[in-house]
Structure formats: C-alpha cells, structure tokens
Amino acid sequence: MGGHSDVVGGALIVGDQALGEELAYHQNAMGAVAGPFDSWLVLRGTKTLSVRMDRHSENATKVADMLTRHARVTRVLYPGLPEHPGHEIAAKQMKAFGGMVSFQVEGGEEAAVEVCNRAKVFTLGESLGGVESLIEHPGRMTHASAAGSALEVPADLVRLSVGIENVDDLLQDLQQALG
C-alpha cells in the first residue's frame, strides 16, 4: 500500500461481522496497531496507489509477454496470461493482474541465480509492490527455509516485483540478464 518500500503493514478484511469483531478484539488486546509515522507513510502511499497499480500491471503484462517468447524461459507464472491456472479467477476478482511475475529459466538453479546477478535495472531484493523493480531467487532467499518440504519452490524460479519504471528499460534489462 505504501509503495515506497519503507513501511510494513497489512489488513484483514472479512465478510463476517462476528469474525471481524473477534479479530478487532484480539488486535486491541495484543496492541498490534501501527504507529503514527507508519500510518502516515501508508496514507501517503494511498494517494498514488491507483496510478501505481495501473503502471505495475501494465508493465508486468508486457514483461510476462516478453518472457513467454524468450528461448531461455521454460515457464511464466502471471495471472494475466490466459494459460495461467488462476487466470479465470483473477479476471473475475481483479481490475488488472498486478505486478508480480515469476518465471523458470533453462539451466537450473545456477542459471536462475545468474539472471538475478546480471540484472541492472531490477535490483536484487526481497520486497514487493514498491515503485522500483526487484528481482530475486526465492529458493536462496525468501523460501530458503522451505527447502526439502512441500513448500519448496523450483530451483530454477526467478521472481520479479515489476515496478513503475519505463517498461522498455525493464524489457531490455531482462533481455540482457537472460543473455
């Protein structure tokens, strides 16, 4: 929501009033509320949320499309693609398809890590939804603790949080990173 990678927060939205009241009670009892500065950061971000989300989605759609045609990419995961298993649900629930794109690269784990290391416009990082584009290798970063479990991600997976930069810069960066 903040959009500037400088605050962590969240929301629980439920359709059941009794559950909402129970959650509010527990939140109040635990003191799990945002501080004034964090609240201000989120409020600041909400002022540009709509235009940021439009640009995230627009850029991510173009990135996903380019990746589907790249010879070194074996699979692209983006709900905006008709072949994505969740596409129909996403199309019903969402105005656009967001800025998160994952893809699998030919050559396994080392090739995926190399793509991350070669990126210049995409910054290596473990956040999402900010104005800047980020790239990560989840198997070694956010999901490293899941190795060997049912939650393990494919070793050749690269995850992108597509930002609001000029899309041509993003596409060129991924082209050169993929080699």
Predicted segments, located by residue:
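PLP-dependent enzyme catalytic core of the Aspartate aminotransferase-like
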Residues: 52, 117, 133-179
